[in-house]
Structure formats: C-alpha cells, structure tokens
C-alpha cells in the first residue's frame, strides 16, 4: 500500500470514530426552567434539628439552603426564652432578620441592643466580640444567611493571677 492510501484510510477511520462518538455521547441537559427551580416550604414542613445539644441545649436550626455546618447557608434559628451565650465571635459575617421574640446582643464594652420582629442586623465575622441572649418572655426566631459555615467561638476571659 502506498503512503497516500494509508493516510486516506487512517483519516477516514479518525473521522468515522469522531462521528460515532458524537452520536453516542449523552446530550447535555437543558437548563431547568424557572418554574422547575421554584422552592416553597410551609412553616410546618421545616426540619428543625439541634444546633449543638452539648454546647447550646435547646437551640434549634432549620436549614433552608446549603448546610450550616459545611459552608454557605440560609436558615432559621430558634433560641429558647431566656437562653444566653457568653462573650463570643463568629468566623463569617451573618445577615439576620428577626421573626419573633426579642433578641438581645451586647457588643463588648457597649450597651445591649434589643431587636424585635422585623428588625435587621449585619453581624461582622472575625474579631467582633459580643454576647447574645433571648428575652425570657418568649422564644426568639430569626433568619440568618452567611457565605461560610456557622461557628461560635467562646472568648476565654483572663483569670486573675492569685498570689501565693
């Protein structure tokens, strides 16, 4: 066989293989329509779980999207009436809308702020030190959204040194 014939046969096989591969490749899915992406959840259908049964007994969370333990999320959080958290920080910023109850936050060294239903707060992450509590008259429910996983780092207070 001449070199030109071998070249033509090889080229024909390559083209034929490419055509067969195109026909057998799975078709790309069309993007979902807006109606197919719609999510609606009744309040009674929320899946409330314990946020941290050991460190925050009674505090519940219901993820709406994402996963609060792994990364970006949107969720409802419920604090029991009278619940309080000592001085602490969070790694990530949180945007919060209060749904019910009276939420109380005291930035370190400043007076407490009481926020009721309909109030909004953008709480910075990083070194923003504050206490958090819920008024004892009723549970506090709020919506929180963050670009990172939820965490709570209690600030260790310096203990006085005792002289021997």
Model-inferred region functions:
Residues 1-9:
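Bacterial N-terminal signal peptides that target proteins for export
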Residues 8-18:
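Bacterial N-terminal signal peptides
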Residues 69, 108-127:
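Short acidic-glycine-tyrosine-enriched beta hairpin
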Residues 85-87, 104-106, 129-136:
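Short beta-strand His + acidic residue motifs that chelate non-heme Fe in jelly-roll/DSBH
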Residues 125-150:
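Ligand-binding loop in jelly-roll beta-barrel domains
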